[in-house]
């Protein structure tokens, strides 16, 4: 059993301005990018320094290093990533390409205005008791959980597997393909709730 505890949330703007960021956010864990009040993330990532990694993400959007969806509101239901006859790169600005009349910058501003980042801590449990892990073992478990979440979203939402790269992410978990029994909990201060049916 693995528990994923969402312990903090922050808006993209607040993270850039470093407003009330707890020290724990700079540690190892899984994080999620959510648009507006969506119940599913458009990005899942892991890092040893989640706060620093997410600031890098936001700067990469500004610098045109990532694919950028032309209409960020489509990140609410992820329809722009569904694997069907309508799936197309035309829904995105490609990395490094200039958009017409500042459209890229407008899309990034809209994204940042409505983007929430959730920070989660992964704990391996045995009979309900946390298992002590080395840093290397903990990183491996976190990577396995990231990959499992990504795979479940692809399967249950019929997403094109390339959606992971479209949002700046790497393939989670290396070569590991381990299915953990997952539980999802939240701190009282976190108001965003994700749809567990797409993962668990």
Question: What residue spans do the PLM features occupy?
Answer:
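Boundary/linker segments flanking structured domains
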Residues: 1-42, 48-200
